[in-house]
Every structure is written in structure tokens, then in C-alpha cells.
A protein has these predicted regions:
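Metabolite-binding pocket within alpha/beta catalytic cores that recognizes anionic/polar moieties
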Residues: 1-67
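Non-catalytic positions within long, well-ordered alpha-helices that form the structural scaffold/packing
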Residues: 12-15, 113, 132
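Short acidic/polar active-site loop segments enriched in Thr and Asp
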Residues: 17, 118, 137
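General beta-strand structural signal in soluble alpha/beta enzymes
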Residues: 19-23, 39, 90-96, 120-122, ...
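Metal-dependent peptidase/peptidase-like ectodomains
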Residues: 57-96
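Active-site/ligand-binding-proximal alpha/beta "capping" segment
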Residues: 81-118
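Zn-dependent metallopeptidase/amidohydrolase metal-coordination segment
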Residues: 122-151
Length: 151
């Protein structure tokens, strides 16, 4: 987990203030289809861990960072406007991060759907948490590459 997030600490030290994250993931929402681009508006952390566990380094952020708005609204509006100008279809949704390397079971996918998840994958959530912790603005876009088991 720390290795995945390390580059974002370096980016912060280099002065980067905003990041765009992308991923390929499984669709849970039945209104989505493979090839759908989903603007991530929120996340659910089901990874069983958090990259901020451990001693806090105050140079980067507070001990208990706020995750109320993990994805920057201004960047989302810019992405929406740009997609509309270019005629690119997209959906908005909640991304659920799940620890791999196994894919989810059909029962897990049903549970995740009940929790409000639109898509599921094995990345993006730790990076989002670390970037928010450091005060970086985050935009994240998923490409639905397949429908999750049981959908």
C-alpha cells in the first residue's frame, strides 16, 4: 500500500497541486456497459486497510483528514464541460475499492450494489486518500471494462 502511494508524496514535494487518476474496473450499475466512462464522485473503501495508518508526518497533512469531498468539484465540472463539448458520453458514480488479487464473488457484488457502489476495482482509493490528505485536488475517471460477477 505504501509503495503504491509513494509517488504521490514525491509529486507533492515537487509542487504538484492536482492529479487526475484513471482506472479500468468492473461495472456494478446495470445502466453502465463495458466502455462506459465513469466520473468518480465518491468512493467506498473495502480494501481492509488505509494508506494513512501509522505515524503521521505533519509536513504532509493532518492526522485525521476530511474525506467529505474526495474528488474536487471544480475539476469535475471542468471534466463534464469538456466531455460535453467533445461529445463524449459519461456517467457519474461511486467507486468501490476492493483488495485483490481475486475478483469479487457474486454475493460481494450484490452487497456492494446495496451499499451504493456503481463500479468496483483494486486501485484508486488509496491514491485518492493520500492526495486528499496532502491537500491535492483529485479528479478520477473509471473505464468500465466488464460487468462485475453477478450483474
Amino acid at each position: 500500500m505504501k509503495e503504491v502511494c509513494y509517488p504521490f508524496y514525491v509529486l507533492k514535494l515537487l509542487g504538484v497541486e492536482q492529479v487526475v487518476l484513471t482506472n479500468a474496473c468492473g461495472g456494478i450499475n446495470r445502466d453502465f456497459a463495458p466502455g462506459t466512462l465513469m466520473l468518480i464522485t465518491d468512493f467506498i473503501n473495502m480494501m481492509g486497510t488505509n494508506p494513512l495508518i501509522g505515524p503521521n508526518d505533519e509536513r504532509f497533512g493532518p492526522r485525521f483528514p476530511d474525506m467529505t469531498e474526495p474528488y474536487n468539484l471544480e475539476l469535475q465540472e471542468l471534466a463534464k464541460h469538456t466531455a460535453e463539448e467533445m461529445g463524449i458520453d459519461y456517467k457519474e458514480g461511486t467507486y468501490l475499492g476492493f483488495m485483490g488479487p481475486c475478483y469479487e464473488t457474486a454475493a460481494e457484488i450484490r452487497a456492494f450494489a446495496g451499499m451504493g457502489a456503481d463500479a468496483v476495482g483494486m486501485s484508486t482509493v488509496p491514491e485518492t486518500m493520500v492526495c486528499n490528505y496532502m491537500g491535492m485536488k483529485v479528479l478520477a475517471i473509471s473505464c468500465i471494462t466488464n460487468m462485475a460477477t453477478g450483474t
